[in-house]
Amino acid sequence: MRILVTNDDGIHAPGLDACARIAAALSDDVWVVAPETDQSGVAHSLSLNDPLRLRKVAAQRYAVKGTPTDCVIMAVRHVLIDNPPDLILSGVNRGQNIAEDVSYSGTVAGAIEGTILGIPSIALSQAFGPQTRDNPSYQTAETHGPDVIRTLLAEGIPAGVLINVNFPDRTPDQVAGIAVTAQGRRDQKLMRIDPRKDGRGNDYFWIAFERRSADTVPGSDLRALDEGRISVTPLRVEQTDEPMMTRLAQVFEAR
């Protein structure tokens, strides 16, 4: 099995090395194609106005001046064009990718692009808390990741579906199990703009997030991480809302 590893934190991110080790526990044919620089929050963006630059870092390891989506396309359509990967692992992200994070995440986008290209794809993210944010450990992801992935591959990932896996901020032996979850939703009032001034008195701004309340919906990815469980969420690339499509068809046909 040939595995492609990518991420959004960049070619030098510790989480990328952790993901490569997870892949190495599953196969001896592992390739890494990741962004040259940190691409966190770029979502599923594609570089159309700037050329892509490809740099060979080491054997079977490349850096791309571009987004995670660019990296997957570069890998599948150029680097590995004669023998495409059988599996794409995107991560391990520094921080959780749950709820609305999924829409912004370059890590999840790497898996989305792989799914669009017809390759089974899994996004992997490691949550951290106030005590671990400065130096997050990927040991929980490394310990439990291979078994989770083997189980997913044994079951089979349908076409058009990607898997979003989040590991809790727990040591490997403290993980409370695995939960198959739905994508959660945060209180959007927690998002705010933090205004500041630079040394010359000019305004600048940060997008900031207040700490959310402890109330989460049972069965959601948010609740799973709160309970110290690994969250496994199947996501669809196809975003059509079929019930609404049916309703609108009836509305417009009746005009």
From Swiss-Prot:
Entry-linked InterPro entries: SurE, SurE-like_Pase/nucleotidase, SurE-like_sf
Keyword set includes Transport: no
Main location as per UniProt: cytoplasm
Record field: catalytic activity: a ribonucleoside 5'-phosphate + H2O = a ribonucleoside + phosphate
EC numbers on record: 3.1.3.5
Keywords: Cytoplasm, Hydrolase, Metal-binding, Nucleotide-binding
Residues engaged in binding a divalent metal cation: 8-9, 40, 93
Function according to Swiss-Prot or TrEMBL: Nucleotidase that shows phosphatase activity on nucleoside 5'-monophosphates.
The name this protein goes by in its record: 5'-nucleotidase SurE
Organism for this UniProt entry: Azorhizobium caulinodans (strain ATCC 43989 / DSM 5975 / JCM 20966 / LMG 6465 / NBRC 14845 / NCIMB 13405 / ORS 571)
Lineage: Bacteria, Pseudomonadati, Pseudomonadota, Alphaproteobacteria, Hyphomicrobiales
Gene name for this UniProt entry: surE
